[in-house]
Amino acid sequence: MRERVKTAYGDRVSDTPDPIAEAHRQWSSRWPEHADHMAAVTSVMRAQQLLLSRIEAVLKPYGLTFAAYEALRLLAFTRTGTLPMGKMGTRLMVHPASVTNVIGRLERRGLVGRGPSPDDRRVVLATITPAGRDIAEDATLALNRSGFGIADLPAAEAAEITAALRSVRVSAGDLP
């Protein structure tokens, strides 16, 4: 039977109860002072799973993961199409080994090139190729059409989510 479930996270119609709301209820009976924090983190983690799945479905026809798309898009945004791989890691907020792996996969597909910096041989540069630019543009159009997985959310709500998560990032030390 479908029922309207009222939770602290809004009303929804469901055949089954919201597992996070149920976890919140259970947590509240044992650790009430932590229940809201647990539910917030669990909700963010679940939303991340759902959105990554939607985004990767959009990117699949292009043979890209979201990490690979982000790397291509970052390179495409630069004036020269080239960045030091260390700087890419900083801008993408990932470990340098992750950048190396992603760039390696993109390089094997001919979407980026990799080589030493002419100014400092210790620095490895990644450069987007014309084929990489084409795929980055096509994938960006597809993601824009999909609303990045949240097309059904009003823009104002998306902005509210961004603002709320910014405070989480500040609290976690990700931003000043």
Regions found by a protein language model. Give the residues of each.
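DNA-binding alpha-helical recognition surfaces that contact promoter or target DNA
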Residues: 73, 101, 163
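Exposed, interaction-prone assembly regions rather than primary DNA-binding/catalytic cores
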Residues: 157-176
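Charged, amphipathic alpha-helical coiled-coil/dimerization segments
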Residues: 104-159, 163
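N-terminal leader segment of winged-helix/HTH proteins
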Residues: 1-62
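Canonical helix-turn-helix DNA-binding module
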Residues: 66, 80-125
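N-terminal helix-turn-helix DNA-binding core of bacterial DNA-binding proteins
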Residues: 35, 45, 49, 53-95
